[in-house]
Amino acid sequence: MRVLGIETSCDETGIAIFDDQKGILSHQLYSQVKLHADYGGVVPELASRDHVRKTIPLIQAALREAGLGKDDIDGIAYTAGPGLVGAILVGATIGRSLAMAWNKPAIAVHHMEGHLLAPMLEERAPEFPFVALLVSGGHSMLVRVDGIGSYQLLGESIDDAAGEAFDKTAKLMGLDYPGGPLLSRLAEKGTTGRFTFPRPMTDRPGLDMSFSGLKTFAANTIAANGDDEQTRADIARAFEDAVVDTLAIKCRRALKETGLNRLVVAGGVSANRHLRAQLAELMESLKGEVFYPRTEYCTDNGAMIAYAGMQRLKAGVFEPLAVKAVPRWPLDTLDPI
């Protein structure tokens, strides 16, 4: 069986085809970074319009890359939420239209379930159950995963997501958009220990997180110490250390509370090398395992949507004729399959 996956929840247009025997047959991705750079962030209306321009050509390119036609596709999966409603509607409408025109099942996929399952595309894939740390520009959450669709939310950010905090702090430091990866590169030049940032919400029980205060702390530190190149690098180092330490502390707690020893880390921030190194040390100390998607599947992409769609199609889960777009959609409301 083969599923075409469509991802348009924010500022990447991602298209992929997944074969349940051969894996990913094609993977097309277009990023809108240049489009939004002048504005310092994603402009929803511009994002939607660009998805309108790019989605169908990328679907055609994915079919050509795989050497397939419409008759070779068994289902069409699309991101139905959460995300920017206009952007979601573009992919959802195109996906549903193709499904009706080609007489194929349409599968609405939860964007964060796509991220959560992305490590399943790797040769070394995790087995259920496990704890998942989902960290991106829009979400930071810890989830107990007992199976596909069987999710228990353990904790989440009560304000900014980790990726959002990276981008906002980078903007404060005068870095270009998107600033998160640039801040991490700058942090590599920094001196550990010159500045010490708080580890928010680690001094109390629970698995919820908070990152907005780190942005304010960074602004105050810059104001008090100047912004020469080395100072900026040292502040970036302190900021990244605080975020990574906080995530690692929360992961340790989640694993202890659940009694599990497998950790999945996914979402855009999961590509952060410092985070990967620290979580690898954590899991080694716990005699457990940690799993990530490859870097190209950390950010938004169609491959994760095609894979998640395939699992639901195999379970007989597909959509009625109405187009489904859900801007706010808690992950733990999905039904197990």
Curated annotation (Swiss-Prot):
GO MF terms, alphabetically ordered: iron ion binding; N(6)-L-threonylcarbamoyladenine synthase activity
Enzyme class per UniProt: transferase
Co-factor remark: Binds 1 Fe(2+) ion per subunit.
Alphabetically ordered keywords of this record: Acyltransferase, Cytoplasm, Iron, Metal-binding, Transferase, tRNA processing
GO biological process, one term: tRNA threonylcarbamoyladenosine modification
Catalytic activity: L-threonylcarbamoyladenylate + adenosine(37) in tRNA = N(6)-L-threonylcarbamoyladenosine(37) in tRNA + AMP + H(+)
Cofactor entry: Fe(2+)
Described purpose of this protein according to its UniProt entry: Required for the formation of a threonylcarbamoyl group on adenosine at position 37 (t(6)A37) in tRNAs that read codons beginning with adenine. Is involved in the transfer of the threonylcarbamoyl moiety of threonylcarbamoyl-AMP (TC-AMP) to the N6 group of A37, together with TsaE and TsaB. TsaD likely plays a direct catalytic role in this reaction.
Cited PANTHER family: TRNA N6-ADENOSINE THREONYLCARBAMOYLTRANSFERASE, TRNA N6-ADENOSINE THREONYLCARBAMOYLTRANSFERASE, MITOCHONDRIAL
Protein name as catalogued: tRNA N6-adenosine threonylcarbamoyltransferase
Organism: Aeromonas hydrophila subsp. hydrophila (strain ATCC 7966 / DSM 30187 / BCRC 13018 / CCUG 14551 / JCM 1027 / KCTC 2358 / NCIMB 9240 / NCTC 8049)
